[in-house]
Amino acid sequence: LIHNNGKNILRRGITSKDDFKPGETCLRSIKDMKLISLANTKFYPGKDEFYSFCRNTPSILIIPINIKSFILIGGWSYRCFTKSDEKWINNWAKKLNNIFLKNSF
């Protein structure tokens, strides 16, 4: 899911049809401009924030694009994202930010 300026602008894969509204965790990611990895959402007290994304997703990455946009990726097993995955998606976030800047998104 790509969320930009209060709107979900792209959904791919198996996600809920509900409108995703970012909560505290997503907002902290873009405020701090840091990737947040929830390796096992079963133990995360704020997991309800992601129910409208995809209920019971075992792991989640929140990747900031800029101060008003982020990428949300769900994994289908616990601890499924590697450091290489995180670096790869961070680079995609940088590319998306460049596209947003060029096109006044």
Regions found by a protein language model. Name each.
Residues 3-53, 58, 72:
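Regulatory sensory and allosteric helical modules in signal-transduction proteins
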Residues 70-80:
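Short beta-strand-to-loop transition segments that serve as allosteric relay/switch motifs
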